[in-house]
Amino acid sequence: MLLKVEQLRDSVRIALLTPYDGGNLGDSAIQAALIANLRRCEPHVDLCGITLHPARTSARHQIPCYSLTATSRSHYRGTKERDDGERPLPVAEASVGLYRRLRRMARAVPFVRWLKTGVDETLHAIRSYRLLRDVDVLAIAGGGQLDDEWGGSWGHPYALMKWTVLARAAGSSVAFLSVGACRIESRLTRLFLKTALSLACYRSYRDAESRRLALGITPRADGSVVPDLGFSLSGTSIEPSIKTEGAPLFVGVSPIAYGHAALWPTADQVQHERYLEELAGFVREILRRGVSVTLFSSSPPDDQIFADLLERVELGLDSASRGRLCARNSETVEELFDVLHAVDLVVASRLHGVMLSFLSGRPAIAISYDRKVTSLMAELGQAEYCLDIHSFKSDDLLRRFFALQAHSKVIQSAVASTCREYDEVLKRQCRDITRLALRRRRSRFRRNGDTYSKEARDSGPEGRPGIKPVSGPMTASATETPGTGNRDEMSYGKR
């Protein structure tokens, strides 16, 4: 259902857009951090999410969430909600079978398929516009959103273009917050991203190279370099692992499904097999030296390669070594931190697998599959502990591991200091965004001949006007709701 607001004048409204389906714990950390910071800066802020899986993300973050896309593509799959939430009426099995056959036949006809896509897109655009009329700021909320690897040009690049155009038409401001640029290959992707970036009144990028790539798309994409939103995750404790002399060592290893033919959009099975062999060789060697190893993942595709890696590691191992090897699945960021706090050192490949390790006070070696991981390690002063996934050898990894173990205390202290600095920068960015939202709301009141009710705002949540749910297929219900807005220019000093 959509949420219709009657006479909402007492709180700003911000919509957080992300290609997040509730499974990737790095994206989950980003959204949790941003939500907490926005509420800290503006206690009366009303938030909603625009995601690939509204029901799941709404349940996880306790805000209402709406469908990001009308259609699904390979490696970019959205979900739709039922219009009324009712169960379908019982139908005879024969009728169900006939219905399914007719649907398959219809989808096989190009014209019918294109017509359905057009109708779905039109209806989704109308509902999205209705939502955005009640939003002050559409925030493109962190992560590697300038990218066409997952879903192609008609995946997220198109979604960004569509939502930013609709936001401006609805009178909302658009802000890109600490976004990253990854693979940008096709001309169509560049056109979609050029439109989206040009319509924003605030832009920040999580690293200098992302900013450079964005400026290569359009000179109007200028913005600040502001760290990844995950660095401001509240509730994290950067507590160094304290080991007594001779105590057993525990290591967390987070493999990645990079190149896997069935799990990664750009398949390179030969590279994937080579990666698993080298990683297995490293894990096998440290197990033989008495180290305990825990396999973990921060994204659903990666845990699907645990069995393959375990099989390779266990070849030639004695029973004692096998007993020190285990795998743990994490469904939430909190569970992931439990895993990280139980180990002393980490070997990971995903950006947020590495970043969250440092946030938990655990030094990490990165086996980098992408520029963003290499950039993160360099910014944290850990470039010597970063290996290229395409060329690393198990012996190289073993040498870096021993060096990391020897210098772990120094690394923990240095990285903790940098993380605190990043947290302060991110808090300033959130204050800027809430000020932008407040300006949009006040300008809307003045334009409509209304006055801003400070007394009502100070009365707190119980003094807010009521919110009426109305039917519509876009959203998963939760306790928060969205707001109204328009455009307002603002700047942010370069870090």
Regions found by a protein language model. Name each.
Residues 1-458, 463, 468, 472-476, ...:
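Active-site anion-handling motifs in enzyme catalytic cores
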Residues 479, 484-486:
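Intrinsic disorder/low-complexity segments
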